Design a protein with these regions (language model features):
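Alpha-helical segments in soluble extracytoplasmic regions
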Residues: 47, 51-72
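Short, solvent-exposed, charged loop/turn and helix-capping segments
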Residues: 71-88
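N-terminal intrinsically disordered, cationic/polar leader segments
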Residues: 1-54, 90-121, 127-147, 151, ...
Length: 157
């Protein structure tokens, strides 16, 4: 017999349900986990509890970086078509920079990498919502690390 590999995809219908908020949440989480890792490393004495905690923090940080890459690739590859690309021809370069920064966040524990990634994600988010004709505004995230994110201005009920 042969083994069938597990395959995952967005829906490929296309469903038209795309939202970069998951990417923003993951990027904020990366910065938060970098902060927690660096706090943990400030302790002069590393012990098994610290090491276990560091292992968990690094693992979850890397999961979020992987999610950033996956979600950005899905929106870029499935949502962005010729009309959006014509309007924003630099989106390919932006996506490449996001991929590189997400990898850097996996490789290193430097806060500035996470903050720079968030800036690129915010730019991607602005472009995404603009392609849908939805205005955006900048707000502080209501949880640590309390950095600026781009939010769509939604219709009131």
């Amino acid at each position: 017999m042969f083994k069938i590999n597990k395959v995952q995809a967005h829906c490929d219908i296309p469903c038209k349900v795309y939202d970069p908020s998951v990417i923003q949440y993951s990027t904020l989480s990366i910065v938060r986990f970098i902060d927690l890792i660096n706090e943990e490393l400030k302790d002069a004495e590393l012990n098994t509890n610290n090491i276990a905690q560091l292992s968990r923090l690094v693992s979850v940080k890397e999961q979020h970086a992987k999610e950033v890459k996956s979600e950005v690739a899905t929106i870029w590859g499935d949502y962005f078509k010729e009309p959006q690309i014509s309007k924003f021809p630099d989106v390919h370069t932006l996506v490449h920079e996001i991929m590189q920064l997400a990898s850097k966040c996996k490789q290193e524990n430097k806060r500035e990498n996470g903050v720079e990634l968030l800036k690129k994600i915010n730019k991607f988010t602005e472009i995404f919502w603009e392609t849908k004709g939805i205005k955006t505004e900048k707000k502080y995230a209501p949880y640590p690390p309390e950095l600026v994110i781009v939010c769509p201005i939604l219709k009131s009920v």
